[in-house]
Structure formats: C-alpha cells, structure tokens
Amino acid sequence: MSHIFAENGEKAMRRILMIVFLALAGHLLNGQQLPGIELIMRLEGVDSPEDLDSYEVERLESLLDRPLRINHASLSKLKETGLLSHYQAVSLIDYRSRHGDVLSYSELSAVDGFGADFVERIAPFISFESGSLPGMVASDLGTSHEIAVKAASKTVIGSLETDPAAFSYALKYTLSDAGPFAAGIAFANSYDGRGLKPETVCGHIRYDLKRARGKIVAGDFNARFGQGLALWNGMSVGSLATPSAFLKRSSGVSASSSFSGAYALRGVAADVTFGRIRFAPLIAFRHERKSASLLPAANVSYFGRHGQCGITHYAEFSMTSERTSIPDMKTSADFAVCLHGTDMFAECAYDWASGSSAALAGAVFPVAEDMRMAAMIRFYPPGYSPNRSAAARSTTKCTNEHSVSLSGEAALGGWLDLNGKEGFGSSVRRATCTFSLDAACFPETKEGEDPRDIQLKANTEWTVMLTKAFRLKSKASERIRTWGQPFRTEIRTDLTYMSDPWIATVRLDAVCSEGFGFLSYLEGGYKTSKMAFYMRQGVFLVDNWDDRIYSYERDAPGSFSVPAYYGRGVWTALTGSWRFARWGRMYARAGLLTYPFMQKKKPGKAELKLQFIFYI
C-alpha cells in the first residue's frame, strides 16, 4: 500500500511541477542575458559545460557573484583570481599608479597586455568600482566577510529496501580586504560521510607584501606554473575545443578555500616580485597513518614586455618508518611570448625518477580580421609521470601520448544589437563557428596486442543568432580509436530563447557508439538581480554505458554537477535563488529522477539542497 501511495505522490508532484513550468514558459518578455555557466565557458575556452572542472566553476562563480574590483585589488589579488597573467596584473598596477583608476572597458582594453577580445571575456568577472575622482587611485574599502552554509539530503525511491536518507553539509568562511590580510576556511561532509564530523577541511591565511610586491600563504594553496607540464596542482581543462583553451595563464601561488579542497597543496608558499623577476618558493606536506610526504618546490620567472620565461623544480620525499625515498621529481623550463598578435608558448620537462623528457609547443594566431586559429604538438613518453601535471592532453593523463591538435574560430555575418543592452558588449556577431581536430598516438597499447594505439577526434560547433532573442547552437563530434568501441558520434542542438528576465532552452542530444543513446530536456527560467528560478524536465533513453550522455545541471555555487545519464528514465529539477537582503542570498534545488521505461525495475532518487551565503 505504501508503494502505491509513493507512486501516486510522485505523479502528483510531476503534474504540479509541469503546470508551474508551462506557466513560466508562457510569459516570455523582451531583453537578453547570458547564463553564468556560458560566461565561464567562454572564459575557459570550452564549447560545453560538461568539459569544465568543478573547482574552476566554484572559483569563477564566486567572481560572478562578487566581481573582482580591479581598482582596489593588490597585485597578489589580481594574479590569484586566475583572470590575469602576471604581466597583465603588473601592467594594470603600473597603469593605475600613472593614470589613476580604470573606469571603463574601453580604457581597460587600451592597457598594455589587454585587448578588446580579452576584456570582453573577463568583463562579467570584474568591477570598475571606485571611490576616487578620475585620475586618482582608489582607497581601501574596508574588511568584508563571506559565510556560506549548505545542506543536502538524498533518498532512494521505488526500492523494496528502506534505506535511510543520506545527508551532507558544508560551511565556508572568507575574510578579504582586511588590509594586507586575507583568510578562509571550509568544512564539508559528503553523502558517504559518517556522523557530523567533517570529511574535508580546507583553509588558508594570506599576507600581502607591499614592498616586495608579493604574498605569503599558509595552509591550503594552489601552485600553477608554465603550461602545467611539471607543476600544476588541481584539475584543468583538457579539452582543446577552441583556440582560447590552448594557452594557459598560470596564476603562480594562490590561496585555496574551496568546499572540497581535493586538489590543494597544504603547507607554506610565497610569491614575490623584484623588478621583472618573480620568485615563488613553497613547501607542502601530507601526513597519513603509516607514511608522510614532503614537497619542496620553487619557480623563477622573468617577465618582459612581450612575454615571459621560467624554470620550475620540485621533489617529493616519501617517508615511512622503514625508509625515505624520492618517487617523483621534475624540472621544467617554459616560455610564452606575444608578437604582432600571435601567442607562442612551449614547455619542456625532465622526469628525474624515470629519466624521460616531455615537451609541448603551440601557437595562437590570427588568420583574418574575424578568424583565428591555434595549433599544438605534444610529446609525452610512456615513462613520464603524470603526477602533478595538468597540461593539455588527448586523454586523462599527461603520459604515453604523441599528439597534435588544431582549432579555429570565426565570426560570420554582421553585428546584432541585443535588446536591453547598451555600451560595451551590447552587440554580438550573427554567427560564429568553431572547429577542432586532435590526433594522438599512444606508444603503449591501451588494450589488446597491437604495438600502439591511435585516436582521432573531430569537433565542430555553430552558433547562430536567429533573432535578437533566439539562438541556435549545433554541435557535432566524432571519435575514432583502435581500442574499446572504435566509433563514437554525437550530435547536439540547443535552441535558446533569452529575453530578460525570462529564458527557455530545448536540447536534443543523440549518441551512436555501441548502440544508440538519446537525451532531451525543456528548461524555462526567470532571472533578475534579486531572484532566479529555473525548471528542467528531461528524458533519456540510453541502453549501453558506452552511449552515456553527460548533461550539466544547474546548482548552487560550489556544487557543480555533471551526471552521466544511462538507462531509460525521466528527471525533473527545480533550481532557484533569492537575494533576500543586501547581505544575503539563498539557493535551493530539488531534483527527482525515475526510470519508468526500464524493463528491469531500477530505483530512482530524490534530492533536496539548500544553501545560504551571507556578506558582512
């Protein structure tokens, strides 16, 4: 009897949600805006949200909510956001000291090291807030505090077993703009956690050095140098779908206080600049029950007017009760220069433990006024250790790969003025096209007895503004390889209606590999500066795991979700946020996933999330 009531309740809930959804989708007005995830995609140079990393999304979502105040930020703050390279940050500081605060996008585009295209990509993440007269430098705004609290509950439905609901929580506190000091700490417990004791703790204390133009960080931090071939902790975008993804902008040493803290190093690090030379020493440690590790590292970089070069070295000491060893040690040299609009970069690294060398080199260059391309070659021998490496790659690790990549993007047609927009960024090209090709040879076979394996990937995407409100995006990709399933073809189309304050999207996605997979959803939403509400209703028919389809799901900041849909089912998701005061915002998400079309019964799940962020 309880099972019957559960099914009736589920149907009633879906009926109510669909009524709300259709009511929202029927009230489209005029105007236009881009969703936050698309702004992040454009900055990172990816063509789909499924290619993004959760840590990067969390970091950039916080900047969308509270943009970087470039007229108040120190050199350390400008660099650690990852928006600007070291040269751009130094150039901006120098411009502010000579000419005063930057007050417009056009003025920022004229600063040495910037440009209109780059400023357009970072525009949503920065603020020109200034309390000074033109030509003067902004003063400090005072201390700010940010507190984020979130809780979630998940339960299995439609199962004969009575499993208790799983519970997770997270808490984060950030102190900033407190003179030279900044600090942050985060606690988190996942669904698999036992009790209320946090599974992960991540925090830092940062002190800015004014005379040396640098900082000291104690606690959890990130160390990212060169193009990521030797030392780049944390995940990075491996996809090379657009030219913007080829060249990495290393942030050096930066503090970390993410909810997960999974990728951060823990220890003490410094980042100081003397003239054109930056020196970044660090030491990180990790302690477990029966072993411990120590990681000393250093980077020295020189920054010129047209580029930079640097040397990075680290060694990992592994210590047990029996012996001490050095399982991982690398040295690398890198450079990046920009000449006449062409970016050229390279990095080579030597793995002392295996005695193997790895290298990459590439360029991003204009072909015509409205077209640019990028090319890269990579040589990663099988013996090269992928530990702490996050360079561009064709698979998941920077090892056992000889590859070449090519990508291009072009703008077609005239300019289209967007409704409700004025000034910088108020118009877009009617059509844009991107393509990418990637060919890789793996010296050590992945499977079988062949001496080597080969993989080819091709991708193209078209974005067309049909009107001032309707946008059509079509993407086609093909992967061919000599192991596993030899072919994987995917075709995806998104039709979006963006009309302030409303938005609606229809997605159709088909995959052909082992069999055939299909996914589609209809989403409607409402967004203003004070509140936002989205509802998504989707269906998927995927009988084979190799045909699985990934789909980005909206969530609260710090909760990036890209589930793989497999089976035959439907899902409904409600996501909303409300700025109830100048100092606070609430986020909520409710999701329901069931499998009514499966021949063999499969339990679904229901999930509820709630998150508060307070600004003091």
Role assignments for model-derived ranges:
Residues 2-12:
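Short, Lys/Arg-enriched N-terminal segments with co-localized hydrophobic residues
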Residues 16-25:
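Sec-dependent N-terminal signal peptides
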Residues 47-61, 106-141, 225, 372-374:
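Alpha-helical interaction/regulatory segments in DNA maintenance proteins
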Residues 54-103, 117, 122-126:
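Amphipathic, charged-and-aliphatic alpha-helical interface segments
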Residues 135-163, 175-185, 216, 244, ...:
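Transmembrane beta-strand segments of Gram-negative outer membrane beta-barrel proteins
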Residues 162, 166, 296-298, 302, ...:
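Exposed, low-structure sequence patches enriched in small/polar residues
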Residues 194-251, 255-281, 370-386, 528, ...:
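Outer membrane beta-barrel
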